[in-house]
């Protein structure tokens, strides 16, 4: 958390807090000599962000924060993906506050790609899934390839700076390369853009079409 006065002088400089699932509390284990924030009647601007970094010391606005947390080009690891997802909040009401009602927003845009197989379950319900044989996934928003993180649901996601851009994607499936693109679009912060190209429609999914890695599930009526 960062607190400023009306002249943008820093009153509380990049103070770390932790969240336990219920409440925020000062991180007393920080080794930077920082102390908790107290009410100050000179305070007029409050900034909060996540994840914490000591590199944000002396920052006085959201744009400066973004400069410290640029999205990484290779987000294939969980650490790189999370480090790219800057969350921000600010209160510029010009009055001192005794309580901060922080509601974070994503500072950047999110691209999500789910190349899918389409089928019907029990001949009636449409269903799509991302096959496990998808590989070598990348996005292009300019000249350099960007490498996304694979989520638990199989989708490939990458965080990028908001801008006007033409998004392209590329991936391999069954030893063939597939590509697609979205036309020039003004990408907005705190917004997810989802792409769901259908690789093929296999119609009714029956056991004779089962492949390694498929899951077998039953509904509440015990139907497979």
Name these PLM-found stretches.
Residues 1-120, 162-163, 180-181, 186-191, ...:
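Short, low-hydrophobicity acidic/polar segments
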Residues 34, 118, 131-134, 204:
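Intrinsically disordered, low-complexity regions
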Residues 123-192:
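Contiguous ligand/interfacial binding patches
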Residues 202-215:
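Disulfide-bonded cysteine-rich modules in secreted/extracellular proteins
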């Amino acid at each position: 958390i960062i607190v400023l006065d009306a002249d943008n002088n820093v009153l509380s400089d990049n103070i770390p807090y932790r969240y336990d699932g219920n409440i925020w509390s000062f991180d007393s284990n920080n080794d930077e000599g920082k102390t908790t924030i107290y009410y100050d009647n000179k305070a007029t601007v409050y900034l909060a962000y996540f994840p914490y970094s000591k590199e944000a010391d002396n920052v006085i606005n959201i744009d400066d924060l973004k400069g410290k947390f640029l999205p990484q080009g290779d987000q294939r690891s969980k650490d790189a993906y999370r480090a790219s997802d800057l969350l921000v909040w600010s209160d510029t009401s010009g009055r001192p506050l005794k309580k901060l009602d922080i509601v974070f927003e994503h500072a950047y845009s999110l691209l999500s790609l789910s190349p899918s197989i389409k089928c019907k379950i029990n001949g009636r319900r449409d269903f799509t899934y991302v096959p496990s044989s998808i590989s070598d996934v990348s996005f292009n928003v300019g000249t350099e390839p960007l490498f996304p993180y694979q989520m638990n649901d199989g989708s490939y996601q990458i965080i990028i700076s908001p801008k006007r851009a033409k998004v392209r994607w590329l991936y391999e499936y069954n030893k063939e390369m597939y590509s697609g693109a979205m036309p020039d679009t003004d990408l907005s912060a705190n917004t997810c853009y989802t792409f769901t190209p259908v690789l093929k429609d296999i119609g009714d999914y029956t056991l004779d079409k089962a492949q390694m890695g498929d899951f077998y599930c039953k509904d509440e009526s015990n139907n497979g």
